[in-house]
């Protein structure tokens, strides 16, 4: 749709990697690899010169501590200019959609002409955290000034401290996941399931028309 300055934004093409269950066919593939595969394939299918891309934006719900900015990593592919900006964002389940929206806004505002935006997730590659108590003990040991003090810190470790902690899905403040919050909002605003399905169908049909 056109912005206030008359610039019209279009989604030219899109690609997606296969969906598989965590720990199966793609268990050795990281989220950043999936994002790079998709970006390269997009350029290949559209014959787009990567040098024409002005910005890269990617959404990710559970980023890896080893790859904190997945958008930046995608932008470092040799196909893209070295000087383009790139960043990542998190809006829970809507992270990829938010990345696309952010790209739209950049084009409308005249800050870019071509943007690659999307999202990537690999549940086989999510960070598994240590317990807070174990983390505190490890920090204490790292600051110890002698071997004896370091060993003394390690003696505080208990078996329960070694139990891994998976990333939280629910918000710590509300105890609700994004899906639960959405259901709650729909109920409070009297949005029937049929209306939601009708809207989804309308969007799907519009998307198909745009591709014809």
Name what the model sees in each region:
Residues 11:
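Mature N-terminal segment immediately following signal peptide/propeptide cleavage
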Residues 1-7, 21-52, 67-68, 75-211:
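Acyl-thioester C-C bond-transforming condensing/cleaving domain
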Residues 60-66:
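Glycine-rich phosphate-binding loops at beta-strand->alpha-helix junctions
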Residues 14-19:
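Short polar catalytic/cofactor-binding loops
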Residues 52-59:
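Short glycine-rich phosphate-binding loop at a beta-alpha junction
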């Amino acid at each position: 749709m056109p912005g206030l300055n008359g610039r019209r934004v279009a989604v030219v093409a899109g690609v997606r990697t296969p969906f598989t269950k965590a720990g199966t066919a793609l268990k050795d593939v990281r989220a950043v690899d999936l994002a790079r595969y998709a970006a390269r394939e997009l350029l290949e299918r559209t014959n787009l010169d990567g040098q024409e891309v002005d910005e890269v934006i990617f959404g990710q719900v559970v980023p890896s501590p080893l790859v904190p900015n997945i958008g930046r990593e995608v932008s470092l592919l040799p196909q893209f200019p070295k000087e383009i900006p790139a960043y990542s964002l998190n809006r829970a389940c809507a992270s990829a959609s938010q990345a696309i929206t952010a790209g739209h806004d950049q084009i409308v505002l005249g800050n870019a002409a071509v943007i690659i935006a999307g999202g990537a997730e690999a549940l086989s590659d999510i960070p598994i955290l240590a317990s807070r108590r174990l983390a505190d003990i490890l920090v204490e040991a790292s600051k110890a000034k002698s071997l004896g003090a370091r060993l003394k810190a390690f003696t505080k470790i208990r078996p329960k401290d070694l139990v891994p902690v998976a990333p939280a899905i629910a918000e710590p403040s509300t105890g609700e996941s994004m899906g639960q919050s959405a259901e709650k909002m729909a109920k409070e605003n009297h949005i029937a399931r049929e209306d939601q399905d009708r809207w989804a169908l309308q969007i799907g049909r519009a998307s198909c028309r745009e591709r014809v």
